[in-house]
């Protein structure tokens, strides 16, 4: 095993999409039942992924507009972002490209972004959509299209309530830092002028 490396992972996304629940689910294997905006303390633990031990530092952020000026302070030194939207909220899905990508590109250019669709357990819950007639489910294909649009290397859907794919989200975040995806080579311009 290699020596432990520190990785700073910051979660971002609209308020109430499930960022804090995802962090609590990952770190304590429990699901909080009450919504309390951002009550997750920064967390650090040694994690082994593919034989590599890393010290994973998790930072939660508040998605509400009241925090627009404070939130970017937590971006400094980030190795990877987990950008979350809710699979049952079209507005949070649209804000990925409209709000979050411009903010992250401005304050932390070049830092990889893992795109995550949360609340997977509710997407196929017919009763939820009966109780919330304005809610619009986001499909896996829509998530994949958004991944391409924003240039994210990975898109994962998860449920903090059932813990489906929650560990996969953080494993992917660690892997993208340890083994960054290869950049596509730009094609060389073959039509060059040469003066003799």
Curated annotation (Swiss-Prot):
One of its GO terms (molecular function) is GTP binding. Disruption phenotype: Fewer and shorter root hairs. A motif (Effector region) lies at residues 35-43. It holds the Pfam family Ras. One of its GO terms (biological process) is root hair elongation. The keyword Lipoprotein applies. SMART domains: RAB, RAS, RHO. It is a peripheral membrane protein. Ubiquitous. Preferentially expressed at the tip of root hairs. It is found in: Cytoplasm; Membrane; Cell membrane. Changing residue 65 to A: Strongly impairs GEF-dependent nucleotide exchange. Keywords: Cell membrane, Cytoplasm, GTP-binding, Lipoprotein, Membrane, Methylation, Nucleotide-binding, Prenylation. GO terms for cellular component: cytoplasm; mitochondrion; nucleolus; nucleus; phragmoplast; plasma membrane. The modification Cysteine methyl ester is found at residue 193. A lipid is attached at residue 193 (S-geranylgeranyl cysteine). Residues 194-196 form a propeptide. GTP binds at residues 16-21, 119-121, 159-161. Involved in cell polarity control during the actin-dependent tip growth of root hairs, thus regulating root hair length and root hair initiation. Inactive GDP-bound Rho GTPases reside in the cytosol, are found in a complex with Rho GDP-dissociation inhibitors (Rho GDIs), and are released from the GDI protein in order to translocate to membranes upon activation. Belongs to the small GTPase superfamily. Rho family. Interacts with GDI1 and ROPGEF8 homodimer. Binds to SPK1. This is Rac-like GTP-binding protein ARAC5. It comes from Arabidopsis thaliana (Mouse-ear cress). The gene is ARAC5.
């Amino acid at each position: 095993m290699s020596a432990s490396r520190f990785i700073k992972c910051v979660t971002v996304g609209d308020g109430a999409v499930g960022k804090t629940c995802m962090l609590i689910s990952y770190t304590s294997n429990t699901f909080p039942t009450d919504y309390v905006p951002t009550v997750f303390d920064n967390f650090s633990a040694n994690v082994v992924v593919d034989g590599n031990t890393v010290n994973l530092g998790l930072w939660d952020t508040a998605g509400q507009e009241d925090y627009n000026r404070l939130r970017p302070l937590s971006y400094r030194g980030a190795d990877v972002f987990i950008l979350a939207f809710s699979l049952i909220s079209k507005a949070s899905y649209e804000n990925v490209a409209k709000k979050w990508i411009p903010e992250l590109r401005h304050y932390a250019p070049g830092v990889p972004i893992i795109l995550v669709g949360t609340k997977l357990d509710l997407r196929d819950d017919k009763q939820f959509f009966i109780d919330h007639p304005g809610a619009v489910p986001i499909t896996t294909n829509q998530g994949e299209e958004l991944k391409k649009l924003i240039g994210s290397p990975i898109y994962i859907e998860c449920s903090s309530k059932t813990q489906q794919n929650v560990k996969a989200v953080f494993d992917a975040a660690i892997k993208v830092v340890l083994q960054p995806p290869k950049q596509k080579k730009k094609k060389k311009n073959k039509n060059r002028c040469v003066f003799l």
